[in-house]
Amino acid sequence: MKDQIIITLGREHGSGGHYIADMIARELGIKLYDKDSIESEIVSEGYSEELIRRMDEKPVNFFASRRIGRFSNSLEVNVAEKTFDMIRAKAASGESFLLIGRCGEQVLKDDPHRVSLFIGGDPHAKLCRVMEKKGLSAEEAIEEIRTVDHQRKAYHNYYCEMKWGDARAYDLTVKSDVLGMEGTAEMLIRYIRAFQEKD
């Protein structure tokens, strides 16, 4: 049985991915790293909180970014690479955790303790969830889903070889509306525990 477990979880906006991730992390008794906790750690390294929030899983401004070898003058790229280094360090420390987004499935693709998940959903189910959670009209919710997913996709595809949401990049992809939030979390927990027990 593996003594360390690292779960990377990508998600479509409105799929309930964060809610499901929280249930999984609490059941397994491991740390959840999401936008807020990652921002907090990077801010402690000297980056401004406003800058981090502005660049959170946003696409790179190609006109403002120039790369020289492994180095870049782009703040977006530097913040992203700092995030990836932090993720690798946590994995190398032996810590078990669940990471939401941040190209986790690619950053840790060679780690034998990593299991990668992607949560999507039926468009109507996602629309209803965003409308209810945010108090938006259908038109506003459609635009929010389109914008957020476009930003996540552009961010991910800039840094990763495999495309965002491509099932081949993940160990398991699911639609949360098929079993519901709790049912999806329970199924994924069983999958993760089976992965842990596998030599």
Label each region the model flagged:
Residues K2-R11, E95:
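Pre-Walker A (Motif I) flank of P-loop NTPase domains
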Residues D110-K133, A138-R146:
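Conserved phosphate-donor/acceptor-positioning beta-strand/loop module used by diverse small-molecule
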Residues K31-V43:
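Short beta-strand-centered segment that lines the nucleotide-binding/catalytic pocket of NTP-utilizing
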Residues F84, M181-I189:
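Short, amphipathic alpha-helical "lid/cap" segments that border enzyme active or binding sites
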Residues V60-R66, V77, A138-E182:
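Small-molecule kinase domains that catalyze NTP-dependent phosphoryl transfer to phosphate-bearing small molecules
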Residues G101-E105:
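Short, polar loop motifs at secondary-structure junctions
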Residues T8-D22:
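Glycine-rich phosphate-binding P-loop
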Residues I42-S96:
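ATP-dependent small-molecule kinase phosphotransfer cores
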